[in-house]
Amino acid sequence: VKRPMNAFMVWSQHERRKIMDQWPDMHNAEISKRLGRRWQLLQDSEKIPFVKEAGGLRLKHMADYPDYKYRP
């Protein structure tokens, strides 16, 4: 069972598509670096919708898998 996405992952899922549309030949590593820099530059107020969505995903995950324990 996969862990639920955190706020960065929720946001980056949307943003990655935009970058790939603009630069389809860009390597995944470069896209990830750009996403990391962009996330750091976002204001906390801009992150709120993604934090809320990630919280909802976490709650749903807890309800769906009540005995889940992360084991790397």
Swiss-Prot record:
Cellular localization per UniProt: Nucleus
GO molecular function: DNA-binding transcription activator activity, RNA polymerase II-specific; RNA polymerase II cis-regulatory region sequence-specific DNA binding
Record keywords, A-Z: DNA-binding, Nucleus
InterPro entries in the record: HMG_box_dom (IPR009071), HMG_box_dom_sf (IPR036910), SRY-related_HMG-box_TF-like (IPR050140)
TM region positions: none
Entries under SUPFAM superfamilies matching the protein: HMG-box (SSF47095)
GO cellular component, one term: nucleus
GO biological process: brain development; camera-type eye morphogenesis; negative regulation of transcription by RNA polymerase II; neuron differentiation
Keyword presence, Nucleus: yes
Chief location: nucleus
Source taxon at top rank: Eukaryota
The keyword DNA-binding is assigned to this record: yes
DNA-binding region listed in the record: 1-69
Name of the protein: SRY-related protein ADW5
Organism (species): Alligator mississippiensis (American alligator)
